[in-house]
Amino acid sequence: GYTGCELQDDINSDPKALAMFETIRAHGAVKMGLIKHVDEAAKRQHTPKVAFVAAPKTYASSSGKVVEAAGIDLLVRAMSMGKLHHAMMGTAAVAIGTAAAVPGTLVNLAAGGSDREAVRFGHPSGTLRVGAQAVLENGQWAVKKAIMSRSARVLMEGWVRVPSDTF
């Protein structure tokens, strides 16, 4: 089994693990009605996503920084395009926040099982705080809002030369 502390190399260098996660993803796609047969999953790599969760544990992130169990509510690792993601995709983060807000889900239980509208989880690159408000209406769970913030890094800097007679 997995601990939830795995980093990219732990999963991505293991062909057996990758095949297992792909099998889970393919069968999930059929159950969700996204495809009719598991053989079609290879043509639909972007969805669904597969993630696994665990109760909080202290771990070292991919940068080597120690993430303390006391600072997170649970651990999450997510697959994207057939590999363990280096951090956490926005769509997966919102899904994790939503699942944490619904009592009795695996995510909610991994986070301690309490009523909550926010959760801080550890992922391979560090931590992320997300939230959701879910209510039970007529026997069905409904999500009233989902909350996520992201940090950004500079991807590129440069100059653009425009002739002065352009304006």
PLM features: residue spans?
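Active-site proximal loop and beta-alpha junction motif in alpha/beta enzyme cores
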Residues: 1-167
